[in-house]
Amino acid sequence: MDHHAQHHPRSHACVLPNGLRLHLAHDPAASRAAAWLRVAAGSHDEPSAHPGLAHFLEHLSFLGGAAFPGDERLMPWLQVRGGQVNASTLGKTTDYFFEVTAEHLGAGLARLIDMLARPLLDIDAQRREREVLEAEYLARSADEQTLIDAALALGLPAGHPLRRFAAGRRDSLALESDAFQRALREFHAAHYHAGNCQLWLQGPQTLDELERLAQRACADLPGRAPGASPPPPPLLPFACEALALRLPGPPRLVLGFALDALRGADEQTLLAFAELLGDRSPGGLLAALGEQGLGESVALRVVHRDARQALLALTFELFDGSAAAALEAAFFDWLGALRDDAASLLAARRPLLAEPTAPLERLRQRVLGLPAEIRPACLDALRADRCLRLHLDSELDGAEARWSAGFRLSVAPVAAAPPLAAQRHAWRFELPLPPSAAAEGALFLRWRFPGVPARSRFLALRQALRPLCGQARLGGVEMGLEALGEDWSLSLLGPRDRLEAAVRPALARLLAAPPDWRANGERLSSAERRRSATGLPIRQLLDALPGLLGEPLAEVDDWRRTRWDALVMQAAMPDPRWMPGQAAGERLEPLPPRPGRHRRELAVDGESALLLFCPLPTQEVPMEAAWRLLARLHEPAFQRRLRDELQLGYALFCGFREVGARRGLLFAAQSPRACPARLLEHMETFLQRSAEALAQLPARRLAGLRKALADDLRRAPGSFAERARRAWAEHLGGGAGRSRLLAEAALGLSGDDLLAAQARLLEARGGWWVLSSRR
C-alpha cells in the first residue's frame, strides 16, 4: 500500500495496489455515506467516428454488471433504500456518485465497481438504452443551458472539441456495426481501469474502515498504469466577438471568458467571486443595475473545465435588450473597482460560503479540492478584450440556422461596437460583520391566506426584501420568503443576537409594500413566465403545480384575512405588534384534502409532459408512513415500466414529495412520442397493477425496506441548520416529533397495510391533481 499522499485528522489519501487513487473522509456526525468515482476520460476522448459513445457507456453501466444484474443493480437497489445516484459525462471526465445510509455503503460500492468493471453490454439492452439517449437528446434540443453552451462553442476556434457533437443519439450510435461494438469495448478497456480512476468515500466509518471497504470492493477493478492526457487545445482566439441567439424568455446578456491559467482548486475563488457578484446590498452591482433599469439578476457558471483552462459564463437578465451595452460597461467598471482590493474582498466573502449539509454536495466539494485558498490572480483573464458576448432574445431579425455541438441553433452575427464608457460609479463593497460569539438561532414565520395569493404580489414583496436579505447575510443570517400555495413563510437562520435586527425591518417591509408593487409585480410575473418558458416542459409544470392546488385568492393588498403561526428555536419571538395578520393562537393545521380528480392544463411548448400528484388522504401517522414506503417500492418499478419497457422518454420520476404545503406521491413524465392522455393512462395502469406486486412482496424484503425507511426517519440531523429545518418541516406536517412517530409506524407496517394504502391511493381519497401540457 502506497501511503505517500496527504494526511489529515479527518481525511486521508492513498493508492491501492491496483493503482486506484483513494480519498477518504471521516464524518463522525453523519448517518449517511457517499461515494464518488471519477474516470479520467469523457466525450473528448471518444473516437470521432462514434459521437456520444462515452455518454452511451455511462448509460449502459447503470444497466448492471456481471455480479448484480436486474433489481440488484445499483440504481433500483438504492432507490428502495432511500438512496440517491447519478452520473455525468463531461469533456475529459465521467463521474459516478451515490449516497445511502452508512451501513449500506459497502454494498453500494460493490455494485458501483461491478457495473463499471464488468458492464453487461447486452445488445438488446443497448437498443433500449439508445432510445433513451434519443429521448434525452430531443429534450436537450430545447433546453436553455444546452443551447447557450452550444452557441458559446460557435465562438471558439474551429476544431475545438466543444464544437463537436458529444451527447449521442440514435443516428450516431451504430449498434449493429461490428466497428461500433469494438470501439465501445476498446474505450471501456482503455479508460475504465484503476489507474485511470479516483474514488472518494465519505461517511461516519473510521478511515481504516473506509479503506477496507474500498479494498474489498475495488479489488476486481483492472489495474493498469494511467495514460498520458494531451494538453487541451486553446480556447483563444475567439472566432467572433459577439453573437445573438434566438431563445424564449427575457432578454439576457451572456459574457463568456476564457481562463487559461487555472490551478486545481481555483473553484474556491470562483465561488467567492460569485458570492460577491450576487450581493444585493446597497451600493453593489445588482443594486446599481436595478436602480438604473438595466438588469435583474446574474448567474455564474463554469461551462467547461479541462486542466488549467475553463470557459466561464456570466448570464445577466436584462430589463430590456437595448440595455446590454450599458450593463456590460457597468460590470467592467465594477470589476475594475473590485480589482483594487480583490484579495481582501474575496477573502472576506469566504465565511459566507456555508458548508453544504447534503452528503453528496459535501463530497462534491472534496472532489473539487475545496476548501482551498483564495487566489485572485485567476480572475485576471476577465477582461473586455477576452470576452465573447452572447445576446439572447426571443425575437431575432436576420437569424440563420447553424449547427453546433450537434444542436440546431437560430443565430445572427452581431457587429462589433466600440465599448460604451461607463460613468464612474462609487461602488461600495460591504464587508461581512465579524463572526458572532452567540449561539445559532432560527425563526420561522408562516402566514395562511384564505386562498392562493396572486403570484405578482409575492414576487413584488420578495424583491422588496432582497436588499434586506443581502444586509442580513453580511451578518451571517440567511433570510428568505417562500410561497407554499395558500401559505407564505419567512425563515431566518443565523446568530441569535442578530435575528431581531434582520426580522424587524423585513416585517415592516411586508406590511408597507412599495407604492409601485402592483406594476412591479406584473413585470416580475411576466419575466418569470418568460424565464420558465426556457425550461423543460416537465420543469415548467413542476414550477406551476404548487400554485394550482388551491383556489386563487381575489386580489387584496393587505394582510387582514391572514393568520400566522411561528416556530422559534434558540431565539426570541418577534413582538406580535410587528407582525402582519392575526395570530392563530396555536399551530396551523395542515390543509385538508380535496378528494376526487382535478385536471389542469398549461400552455407549454415542446414535448408532452404530465404530473400526477396524490396528496395524503389523512394526516394520520400510519398512513403517511405507508405512503412513504409505497413511494420507495414504486420508484424503481415506475422507472423500469415507463422508461425501459414502454420507452416513453428520458425525464420521468416518482417519489414522496412536498408540493407547496401538501405532501404526497408525485409521478412525473415527459415524452417525445406519447400525448398527455396516454401518459396518464400509463400511470393509472401502473398503479392498478402495482397492487399485484405488493401482494407478492416477500416478508424478508418488506422487513428490510421497513428498517431502511425507519432508519432514514430517525436519522439525527448533524448541524443546527439541519435540525431547525427538520423541526420546521415537522411543524408544517403535523407537529414536533413527527419523524420519530413515522419511524415507529414504519417498523410496524404489514403487507396488508401497504395494500390498504394503495387502495386509498387508487380511490383518490386525498385527491388526484393532474397537470399536463396542452396538446
Swiss-Prot record:
The protein, known as: Coenzyme PQQ synthesis protein F
Keyword terms: Hydrolase, Metal-binding, Metalloprotease, PQQ biosynthesis, Protease, Zinc
The UniProt record lists the keyword Hydrolase: yes
Main function: Required for coenzyme pyrroloquinoline quinone (PQQ) biosynthesis. It is thought that this protein is a protease that cleaves peptides bond in a small peptide (gene pqqA), providing the glutamate and tyrosine residues which are necessary for the synthesis of PQQ.
GO biological processes: proteolysis; pyrroloquinoline quinone biosynthetic process
Note on cofactor: Binds 1 zinc ion per subunit.
Active-site residues, Swiss-Prot/TrEMBL: 58
GO cellular component: cytoplasm; periplasmic space
Biochemical pathway: Cofactor biosynthesis; pyrroloquinoline quinone biosynthesis
Family to which the UniProt record says this protein belongs: Belongs to the peptidase M16 family.
Enzyme Commission number, as recorded: 3.4.24.-
Species of the source: Pseudomonas aeruginosa (strain ATCC 15692 / DSM 22644 / CIP 104116 / JCM 14847 / LMG 12228 / 1C / PRS 101 / PAO1)
Domain of life of the native organism: Bacteria
Gene3D superfamilies: Metalloenzyme, LuxS/M16 peptidase-like
Keyword Hydrolase appears in the UniProt entry: yes
Molecular function in Gene Ontology: metalloendopeptidase activity; metallopeptidase activity; zinc ion binding
InterPro entries, per the entry: Metalloenz_LuxS/M16, Pept_M16_N, Pept_M16_Zn_BS, Peptidase_M16, Peptidase_M16_C, PQQ_synth_PqqF, PqqF-like_C_4, PqqF_C_3
Pfam family, one: Peptidase_M16
Cofactor entry: Zn(2+)
Annotated binding of Zn(2+), by residue: 55, 59, 136
